[in-house]
């Protein structure tokens, strides 16, 4: 069976000879696909297989064999990202987040669209690392692992006008905070909620114009989510 689908190459690794195995994120989820002679200069779609490239792929799927890339039409090579260390570092953070949270072949059309939009806009922001942290928050929201209530998970006391503590997917008051919780001031919590509730990219772009020092806390929050995820795996 042959299918045509859009996809963003997250990673690729060499196979024997000049073959390539690409990890592609698409609306159909994470896919691993084999490209015969994909690293060869004679391959007319070689550039479409490079990491951080958006392409339209023709893929052959004959279970139980691995998917095979028959053709790739490069749509966006994201050259600006590849030519900047800061942008590469920030984009790499988003890629690793996807690789660590998404199941193989689990359809994620909304997350795919979100990631593609972030890739298209990250070169426009003066603070790409903060912008990539916004993606981590959006990913937590997508996974249903971000408590947006206004009360402590344990005692249900109101947190609307106070400092809050977050860990994994939960929200805590000062009394029930523990050594692994991450403190968010009232202002930081407000910014977090603005990011999560933003419906338009322009809102995120406006926030990313300012050097808001919250990205390290968002990254730590995401790391705690990954720890929780690993602990529940069989």
Curated annotation (Swiss-Prot):
Keyword DNA damage recorded: yes
SUPFAM superfamilies: ArfGap/RecO-like zinc finger, Nucleic acid-binding proteins
InterPro entries: ARFGAP/RecO, NA-bd_OB-fold, RecO, RecO_C
One GO BP: double-strand break repair
Keyword annotations: DNA damage, DNA recombination, DNA repair
Role, per record: Involved in DNA repair and RecF pathway recombination.
Protein name from the UniProt record: DNA repair protein RecO
Organism: Chlamydia muridarum (strain MoPn / Nigg)
């Amino acid at each position: 069976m042959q299918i045509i689908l859009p996809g963003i190459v997250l990673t690729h690794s060499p196979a024997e000879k000049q073959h390539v195995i690409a990890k592609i994120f698409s609306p159909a989820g994470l896919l691993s696909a084999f490209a015969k002679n994909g690293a060869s200069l004679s391959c007319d779609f070689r550039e479409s297989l490079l990491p951080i490239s958006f392409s339209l792929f023709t893929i052959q799927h004959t279970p139980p064999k691995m998917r095979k890339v028959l053709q790739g039409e490069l749509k966006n090579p994201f050259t600006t990202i590849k030519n900047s260390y800061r942008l590469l570092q920030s984009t790499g953070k988003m890629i690793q987040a996807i690789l660590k949270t998404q199941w193989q072949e689990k359809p994620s059309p909304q997350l795919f669209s979100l990631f593609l939009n972030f890739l298209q806009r990250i070169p426009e922001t003066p603070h790409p690392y903060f912008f990539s942290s916004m993606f981590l928050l959006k990913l937590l929201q997508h996974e249903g692992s971000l408590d947006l209530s206004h009360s402590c998970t344990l005692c249900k006391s109101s947190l609307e006008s106070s400092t809050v503590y977050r860990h994994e997917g939960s929200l805590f008051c000062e009394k029930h905070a523990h050594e692994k919780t991450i403190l968010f001031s009232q202002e930081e919590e407000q910014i977090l909620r603005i990011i999560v509730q933003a419906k338009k990219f322009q809102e995120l772009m406006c926030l990313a114009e300012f050097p808001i020092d919250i990205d390290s806390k968002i990254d730590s929050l995401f790391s705690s989510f990954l720890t929780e995820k690993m602990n529940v795996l069989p």
